[in-house]
């Protein structure tokens, strides 16, 4: 591909993640976006446990049963001349590590907030990560079809709790049973609720008001809306694209994903204002531009058994620069070895199509036979490239894991190896006895691991809790196995690095007092 062609293709890419607290309606809005992208013909009510409909983005068996997202799905489609890459992320807090890594692979984020509840705990956590990255954040205030909090309070909360300016792109005319429509400040029109096609749009005059002949003008809620708009115009934040690009201001859209109200307006604005792929920093201190003709990418996720019939593993890579071509040779930075990328795919949750070419900003799945690790960099060219490390969390909960049937050791070990490589749970082995210990950020990760071991590898496992522990790594040169005591457990991680699992903070303090020269470290 010629340089000008590459630049043109890269400029079409819009790659973003959707973040929210559980049940704010993230999966529902994802489905509506796919509907506009022409990818699906109908959007089911997403809690599949009751309706029998399953969200397109919830593809794993346990997700369908429980109505929660526990993996990051990737969905791609074309819309208005742009190539959209959506990364749907787990809303459940136990899967925040997977979500954090996903946020490293996007150029923007969409924050979905339940307008009845406002900003919730998980949204706060995820917002922090997006804020640290300095990428644009677009806010969708969802569930307008239900009674919720005052819109002015919701805008104020963005500033008070998250420290980001909010600019209302549209404004609700009523809510719940009294919802009449949306006042569109950008397109200077009113979008009526429960109307189809262009009939739902009413133009505003130069004063920002409807023609007096319109029935809505007789409604007191319309008058209240005009007062709110006047207040926003006089005392609210001014739209500032520079601030939006820096992640200092968020455009706020109101709507209802369930009734598909306000979603199309949101998508059109998002495509218009969201950034195209930008440069990415390297460990060497430089940065790689997306229009650099030499291919480079990084692995942000590994997923086993997306197709249970084939027991496959897919490494999800974000292309940072250049053009991907199936069959190309690349260098894996961690090993220095050259490898050929023959098998590649693009996604719609669990369905996939072979992809022959892709460019910077795209997400590609590579069939993995065990070569890749999360955070790996692959590249072409003479100059070695390694992108910045992805975040890794220190687990807080630990269990000892054994196979229930000792005759099924082979499937037990295969399942352990593949699921641990996905990064949702961490694997440790005790010194001398080589017992398997699993670590996780939350209890749900263990439940998902147990479920998948049984259903995907036919290996029933016994998990014995060893409680909440504090994990601290130690320099191998300073390690003496006599340091292990009843207050700590000496283990090694999958890289062979030693660490102690302390019973509590007192045990860690006792250790620090006894061995003042020993340095212990945590992950994130």
UniProtKB/Swiss-Prot annotation:
Pfam families in the record: EF-G_D2, GTP_EFTU, RF3_C
PROSITE patterns: G_TR_1 (PS00301), G_TR_2 (PS51722)
Subcellular location: Cytoplasm
Domain tr-type G positions: 11-278
Keyword list, A-Z: Cytoplasm, GTP-binding, Nucleotide-binding, Protein biosynthesis
GO biological process: one example: regulation of translational termination
GO molecular function: GTP binding; GTPase activity; translation release factor activity, codon nonspecific; translation release factor activity, codon specific
GO CC aspect terms: cytosol
Function: Increases the formation of ribosomal termination complexes and stimulates activities of RF-1 and RF-2. It binds guanine nucleotides and has strong preference for UGA stop codons. It may interact directly with the ribosome. The stimulation of RF-1 and RF-2 is significantly reduced by GTP and GDP, but not by GMP.
NCBIfam families: prfC (TIGR00503), PRK00741.1 (NF001964), small_GTP (TIGR00231)
Assigned protein family: Belongs to the TRAFAC class translation factor GTPase superfamily. Classic translation factor GTPase family. PrfC subfamily.
Protein name: Peptide chain release factor 3
